[in-house]
Amino acid sequence: MLIGIAYLALFLAAGLLLARWAVPDGSPAVAVPLGCGFGVSLLAALPAGFALVCGFTLRAVWLAAAGAALLCAVLIFAGRGHIRFARDPDRGAMWLCLLPVLAVTLYLLHTHVLHKVNGTLHTGQSCYGDMPMHLGFIEYIAQSGQFPPRDPLLAGAHRCGYPFLCETVSSVFRLLGAGRRAAYLLPMVPAFVSVYGMFWQL
């Protein structure tokens, strides 16, 4: 779990630096949500890119981490003297709105998603059959190491036609030793920050 959190932090740092480079005059209200979006996108793309060469394995996961660290180093070197953010034009109004909504979201994720009850997983998330499908893809990618993955719903007889990059993010955390629930929830937190923050920018 701690390794997964550190891994996520590395990619979020890369995303934040990338956002700082993309919007050099942006305030934290712009850079943090954009950086979270970039970070989660990198977390989907980099391990998948290496997995095309060496399968979806720990080797691909650590090569992706090296790529993210290299990106951080390049962006820090390229942006020397320009790390400071601009002041928030709305003087923190976004954070006053976003943080309570994020707190409620985190509470609901903690209390309603994937709890063990008598050895089985229970959830209050209203997604019906969608969650078991996603969990199946996540587990299959992590366990099989095949990439691009086969479709586990069709006994692996066909390549997966579902847009599976969203599943690889959680599969990375499964390979790093996170439990099923932690792997499912970890990438949701920065994704929610990104979505809520970008809605504010609209």
Predicted regions mapped to residue ranges:
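Membrane-embedded, hydrophobic transmembrane alpha-helices
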Residues: 1-90
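Short alpha-helical segments and helix-capping/turn motifs at coil-helix boundaries
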Residues: 45-52, 93, 122-125, 197-202
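A signal for specific C-terminal beta-sheet/loop modules enriched in small/flexible residues
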Residues: 70, 87-95, 124, 131
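Internal/C-terminal transmembrane anchor helices
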Residues: 88-109
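Active-site lumenal/periplasmic loops and adjacent helix-entry segments of GT-C-fold
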Residues: 104-201
